[in-house]
Amino acid sequence: MSQKKIAVVAVGGNALIRSRDAVSLDAQYQAVKETAHHVVALIEAGWRVVLTHGNGPQVGFILRRSEIARDDVPVVPLEYAVGDTQGAIGFMFQNALYNELQRRGISDTPVSALVTQTLIDPNDPAFDAPDKPIGAHMDREVAEKLAASQGWKIADDAGRGWRRVVASPKPLQIIESPVIRRLLEENVLVVACGGGGIPVYRNQDGTLSAAQAVIDKDRASALLAQELNADMLLIPTGVEQVAIDFGTPEQRWLDTLTCEQAQALLDSGEFGAGSMAPKVEAIVGWLRHAPGKTGIITSPEAMGDAVAGRKGTRITD
């Protein structure tokens, strides 16, 4: 590969939906445009970028529409809904990134969104204990009614409302990582691993079959960073830094963490299971395989300053 460093940037599906009143595709595209502005700044700074994205709200919308229309059209299976979101969100990012590159006069960086599969174990215990939120936030009464009528599993999503939950097995391999590597060699800005990738398992004859599940975007992004030997894993989120005692008078923002410190905070239950914990876990897990590399958690608008060491929380081994 060329000497440019590789950054995997993992954008959450909720980052596309800024509020419960901003769920239209036009509103989501506006959010994508804002993120694209900050991602292209990394390109200008000399990074090669793979952008991954979540899809929790969006895949839930597809499934809900499918359930409403089930008497008229075939129901969309979960794995196909994940594929649908990879296409739709991938298009939004591909278009917005291309336009931002054009506006900045950067003509040597093509953009490509790649449908991506993620290998899982079909016997993963996650299938017996679904816990990955998808779809819109609801109040408890609405969620319980849908759980009763649709056979859903539901859970509180870090105090932000109730959501449907599905199985989220551990990602074992990003099937298309060799393709992503080749694209990076050609200086392509790649959009991949949408929604963590479409979960697939390997049959005895080597073929792949889809699984009814979703993959955690941060864990899949960490695995992709490992397979690409990336130099940085950057996870934009709703706050500029990681905090301890979040939401209390003792709240304290953290500029830096070592893996050991981060793991101790995870073990103590310091971070919310559905919010900051998966991001910190993903970076710590990646750094165990990537000594000397850097993980960063920050807000989208602070990404450039965070990479330069001026903002965000930097996690190192």
Residue ranges and their predicted role:
Residues S2-D317:
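C-terminal catalytic "cap/lid" subdomain
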